[in-house]
Amino acid sequence: MNDTVLVLNGPNLNLLGKRQPEIYGRETLADVEALCRETAAGFGLAVDFRQSNAEHALIDAIHEFRVGSAGIVINAGAYTHTSVALLDALNTCEVPVIECHISNVHRREAFRHHSYISLAATSVLAGFGTHGYALAIRHLAHLRAGRPA
C-alpha cells in the first residue's frame, strides 16, 4: 500500500471562498489543499489533491486510486446527490473512502439530504467546515493503524 491519499473535489469547489461564503466560508481551495498536505504530512502521508467540474475526470481519479492508495477523501459537491456513476466507481474501491462536506447538508435543502456517495463511503463528515478535510485525513491514518472505523 502506498502512502498517498487522494483528496477529490467536485463541481464548483474551485470557487470556494467566493461562492456563497455564508455557507462555505472564506477559505479557498488552495487553503484546503495546504491544510490537507500539512495534516497528511503529520501522519507520514502524501496528498494528491484534485478538483474537477467534470464527472468523468472524478471517475478517472477514483479508478486511479481505488487500489493500493492510503484512501480517498471525496467532496463530490452537487454530484453527491445525483451521480450513480460516481457511486459505481466508488463501489470498486478496495481502500477506505471518506465522504466530506463543508456544510451540514442535512440542515439545507431537502434534495441535499440524499447522498449516493454515502452508499460507498466508509465514513461521512458534514458540517465541520474545511476542518472536515483534516478530520478525514486523520481518520484515514487511524484506519491505516489498524483501528476499526
From Swiss-Prot:
Superkingdom field: Bacteria
GO molecular function, one term: 3-dehydroquinate dehydratase activity
The protein's annotated pathway: Metabolic intermediate biosynthesis; chorismate biosynthesis; chorismate from D-erythrose 4-phosphate and phosphoenolpyruvate: step 3/7
Residues the record lists as binding substrate: N75, H81, D88, I102, S103, R112
Any single biological process term in GO: aromatic amino acid family biosynthetic process
Enzymatic reactions: 3-dehydroquinate = 3-dehydroshikimate + H2O
A Pfam family per the record: DHquinase_II
Keywords: Amino-acid biosynthesis, Aromatic amino acid biosynthesis, Lyase
Family in the record: Belongs to the type-II 3-dehydroquinase family.
Identification of the protein by name: 3-dehydroquinate dehydratase
Organism listed in the record: Methylobacterium radiotolerans (strain ATCC 27329 / DSM 1819 / JCM 2831 / NBRC 15690 / NCIMB 10815 / 0-1)
Gene that encodes it: aroQ
